[in-house]
Swiss-Prot record:
Gene Ontology molecular function, alphabetical: metalloendopeptidase activity; zinc ion binding
GO biological process: proteolysis
InterPro entries listed in its UniProt record: HtpX_protease, Pept_M48_protease_HtpX, Peptidase_M48
Name of the featured protein: Protease HtpX homolog
Record EC number: 3.4.24.-
Subcellular location: Cell inner membrane
Topology in membrane: Multi-pass membrane protein
Highest taxon in the source lineage: Bacteria
Species this protein is from: Brucella canis (strain ATCC 23365 / NCTC 10854 / RM-666)
UniProtKB keywords: Cell inner membrane, Cell membrane, Hydrolase, Membrane, Metal-binding, Metalloprotease, Protease, Transmembrane, Transmembrane helix, Zinc
Length: 325
């Protein structure tokens, strides 16, 4: 998204926030909401990336603690012509990943242990290239600020249930209607904005990510595995913080309750089809990738150590536990 669209999006979310303030507290409530919204936008610009990483207990890694993963991201960043982002691991079984940061110079990428353990090196490269594409397209600032404001709007909607509106703003039916609007319409509108942001940027990041890693089929295979994993492996932190769902490469919500009624992401099959079409146009055949993707994934992370003694470097047959061990 360019800066104009980003500014329009933030302005729209701010108007939603102010509208809830008006419904709950009249003119005074609207002004208080405006002040809070401006403060949140400024705070979000500088700190929303740190908040999201802390929310998911992300652990920063480097070339010593996660050499293969770190070097993979470094190589992909060089391919994209980007500064080296900070690299994080999230100790979460569900395979997934996201990027955050206000600009390419202050960016971070994060992958779950589930993703690193279950995907092949090529698939991990496709996923991280997709996240770097978000950084290059400057989607990350929008993603993090939207997550912050959407969460706040939903929170105010919940407050409306307890506060029940303001007498000055309307008695009787109008007070009830205002409260219902704050409770239902505003959080729903915030979700629609998240959907609009996510659906357009995901296709663009898929395309650019495929260019960065050099093979669209790496990413298409990864998307299929991640989508299947997200359906059966719940991400409890994401379930508790659904406003951040649009940041992930695949919707992390399991569909419990109404969380998944409207997806924040495009249909995975459509994304895979677009990548496969891109591969065909590049003259890349799918047979090699299919063979790789069909291989057992028990030791399939980019640092996976074979169980045999190939190369004579086996450490007594001990199982490698990953770059975070």
């Amino acid at each position: 998204m360019n800066m104009t669209k980003t500014a329009m999006l933030i302005a729209l979310m701010t108007v939603m926030f102010m509208s809830i303030g008006y419904l709950l507290g009249g003119g005074g409530g609207m002004m208080i909401a405006l002040v809070i919204a401006v403060a949140m936008n400024l705070f979000g610009y500088w700190n929303s990336d740190k908040m999201v990483l802390r929310m998911y207990n992300a652990q920063e890694v480097d070339e010593r603690s996660a050499p293969e993963y770190y070097r993979m991201v470094s190589g992909l960043a060089a391919n994209a012509g980007l500064p080296m982002p900070k690299v994080y691991i999230i100790h979460e079984d569900q395979p997934n990943a996201f990027a955050t940061g206000r600009n390419p110079e202050n960016a971070a990428v994060a992958a779950t242990t589930g993703l690193l353990n279950r995907l092949s090196p090529e698939e991990v490269a496709g996923v991280m290239a997709h996240e770097l594409a978000h950084v290059q397209n400057r989607d990350t600032l929008t993603m993090t600020i939207v997550a912050t404001l959407a969460g706040a709007i939903s929170m105010l909607g919940n407050f409306a249930f307890f506060l029940g509106g303001n007498r000055e703003n309307g008695n009787g039916v109008m007070g009830v209607v205002g409260t219902l609007l704050a409770m239902i319409v505003a959080p729903f509108a915030a979700m629609i904005v998240q959907m609009a942001v996510s659906r357009t940027r995901e296709y663009a990041a898929d395309k650019r990510g495929a260019e960065i890693c050099g093979n669209p089929l790496w990413l298409s295979s990864a998307l299929g595995k991640i989508a299947r994993g997200a359906k059966v492996i719940p991400n409890e932190e994401a379930e508790h913080n659904p406003a951040t769902a649009h940041m992930f490469i695949i919707n992390p919500l399991s569909g419990r309750g109404a969380d998944n009624l409207f997806s924040t992401h495009p249909d995975t099959d459509n994304r895979i089809a677009a990548l496969e079409q891109m591969a065909a146009e590049m003259g890349i055949r799918s047979a090699a990738m299919t063979a790789r993707a069909a291989a057992p994934s028990q030791n399939s992370g980019p640092w996976g150590q074979r169980s045999d003694n190939a190369g004579g470097n086996s450490n007594g047959g001990s199982r490698y536990r990953g770059p975070w061990s």
